[in-house]
Structures are given as structure tokens and as C-alpha cells.
Curated annotation (Swiss-Prot):
Subcellular location, record wording: Cytoplasm
Record key words, sorted: Cytoplasm, Elongation factor, GTP-binding, Hydrolase, Magnesium, Metal-binding, Nucleotide-binding, Protein biosynthesis
Residue ranges of the region described as G4: 136-139
Catalytic activity: GTP + H2O = GDP + phosphate + H(+)
InterPro entries: EF-Tu_GTP-bd, EF-Tu_GTPase, EFTu-like_2, EFTU_2, G_TR_CS, P-loop_NTPase, Small_GTP-bd, T_Tr_GTP-bd_dom
EC number(s) on file: 3.6.5.3
One term under GO cellular component: cytosol
Stretches for region G1: 19-26
Protein residues bound to Mg(2+): T26
GO MF term (any one): GTP binding
Organism: Exiguobacterium sp. (strain ATCC BAA-1283 / AT1b)
Family affiliation: Belongs to the TRAFAC class translation factor GTPase superfamily. Classic translation factor GTPase family. EF-Tu/EF-1A subfamily.
Protein name: Elongation factor Tu
Enzyme class per UniProt: hydrolase
Amino acid sequence: MGKEKFDRSKPHVNVGTIGHVDHGKTTLTAAISAVLSKAQGKAATKFDQIDGAPEERERGITIATAHIEYETDKRHYAHVDCPGHADYVKNMITGAAQMDGAILVVSATDGPMPQTREHILLSRQVGVPYIVVFMNKVDMVDDEELLELVEMEIRELLSEYDFPGDDLPVIKGSALGALNGEAQWEEKVMELMNAVDEYIPEPVRDTEKDFMMPVEDVFSITGRGTVATGRVERGVLRVNDEIEIVGLTEETKKTVCTGVEMFRKLLDYAEAGDNIGALLRGVSRDDIERGQVLAKPGSITPHSKFKASIYVLSKEEGGRHTPFFANYRPQFYFRTTDVTGIVHLPEGTEMVMPGDNIELTIELISTIAIEDGTRFSIREGGRTVGAGSVTEIIE
């Protein structure tokens, strides 16, 4: 049986769940799938399928990013269930970068917790433009005043990070109740999805720009060749287009895309916002790796030295407790990978304090596909300590 074609008649939007560990992100993801599938007479994606990343089994925490799809009457959604645990902020960064909007899940029994704040901050850094709130586990709280208090706390926290805390939708429900088929909670999931439909605008896709896709994963299909997966950041990729593999190596490699698929369906082309697998001609599994980008030939080049405007997280935001000096060597997280780099401070600046905003020069130990405006995080030992944006390429 051949693969069925992907239906493009509905607008396509990328969303995802964020929030503190055990507040119910994965349960809500499964509940949305269950409630919408029931309404449309389709098969739902089960909790175990979403939670079923291989690493999962040992620790009962979601590590790998799960991608599922579902539809409302108005839209087709691709949903990433972002890992909630602090150890896996790395995945949060790759996950959150894939969202046109996020559903922030906060348990009514706990209220906002440290990772709630961290995920809101990361959403602000990686450019998640809209957040809708789902207050979960409200069936476990009898006190109406307490619910109002938690809602107020969430709204204030969002406002603190420049999201419109007073205006964005907050839906109160029970993900588990909805997943178990209880009508009153199923209704709340429908209400949530109506809010997502209405509040998260249809994204302005970057289809007019030159094609680029950060490589998230690579695997080989026997007899067909090498497939690179990722989310198309901009432009359009058509079957038989020539593309370049850029970054991490000195010279860029040219190849031809011989096939495009999304959600196991074949496409004639992929466009900005699509999560795809691109089949590459004449490329071996070792010629390409996570952290590189696929791009229209000549449109983006690899660089290792640039000026950037950075914000260094304060101690309160989970950043460093002490200043850093010249020759500081953290990791710089670009799109899907960490690269070590050396920081050169501007003349007359001896040190940079947590909470500072400064322009400085960064020299990476390997090249990355970058251009003005490319965003990145600064990390040490897996912990985000800053965020930045490229302002000028030097070499």
C-alpha cells in the first residue's frame, strides 16, 4: 500500500505543552487527542505512545520530544509534548523552538513552580509568540478562592516575562478526567482548543524566504538513502531541489532532495513550519549530523566569530551566581546543538554580572550556519545561563 497524501486544506499550526514536571502536560496532550478524535470518529494517540520515549521507562519523566497530530474543525495541529524536567531543558529548547504557540499546564494544587517560570522564560527566549494556560487538576481543589489566587499568580508570572498576562486565556479543567471520558472535563478540553484556535493566530509563514531546515535527527533507510528530519524554518523545499548541508565542517556539501515526507505521508514539497523528513541523494549517514542545516545553495554560510547582544540570566532566574570574565568558555546552543565558544569582552569591560545585557564577541570552536538575527542560548553544564542574538558576523 502506498502512503496517503497529506491534506493541506486546513491551516497548519504548531503547538506544544510546557510546564513543571508532573503538572499533567502529557496527560493533557493525550486528553486533547482523545477528545478531538472522539468528536471526529478517529483513532486517538494514547498516553503511552506519547510518554513512550525509550529513556522514559527508567525514570517516569518525559525526556524525548513526542510529536503528535490532531485536528479541530478549523485547523490541523502538530503538537510537541515538551519534556518538563530540568535535566532535559536541552530538549525543551529544541521543542519550544517548534511552536507557534504553547499551552502552559499548571497544576491548581501546586500553582506555578520553578520549571513553570523556567519554561516561560525559555518561551520568551526562543520566540514562542503566544501562550494559552490550562489550569489542571481543578477537580482536586474545593476552594474557589484558591483557584482564583493560582490564576492570578500565573497571570502575574506571564506578565513578568512580557507575555500579556491579563489578557491571555486561562482554562480550568482536569486532563485526567477528560482522558477518562468524563463529560464535564471533556467539555473543558474543547473549550481549551477553542481558545487555542481563536487566540493563537495562524502563523505568518516564512515561505517567501530562502529554504532552511535545522537538522534534528538523521537515519538511513536501506535501499533509499539518508533521511534528515527537522522543522522547516523558512522557505519551500521541493522534490529534486538542490540543497547544501551547512555548518560544523569547513566546506559545505551539495546534495539533491529526492523525497519529502510528513507524518509518514509523501509530499511534493514542504514549506516553513512543516516537520519533515528529507531524503538526500548520495549522502551517507556520516556526512550529516544534528546541528547542521539544510539550505538553498549560497543562502547561508558557516561562521565561527561574531558579535552578539546577550542577556545574562540573574541568579533569581536560575542563572550564574557570580560574574564571568574574558575568555569565559560556555556552550552556545544554536537551533539543535551546543558548540563551545570563547567570549571576548568589549574594551573597558572587566566582567559581566548576572542580570547584565551586553554586546560582546564570541568565537566558536567549530562553524555554525549563522546570520544576523540568529538566536542562541548560553549554557553551562546543561543549565541555561543566558540568551543572545547575533548582531554582526566577523568571520
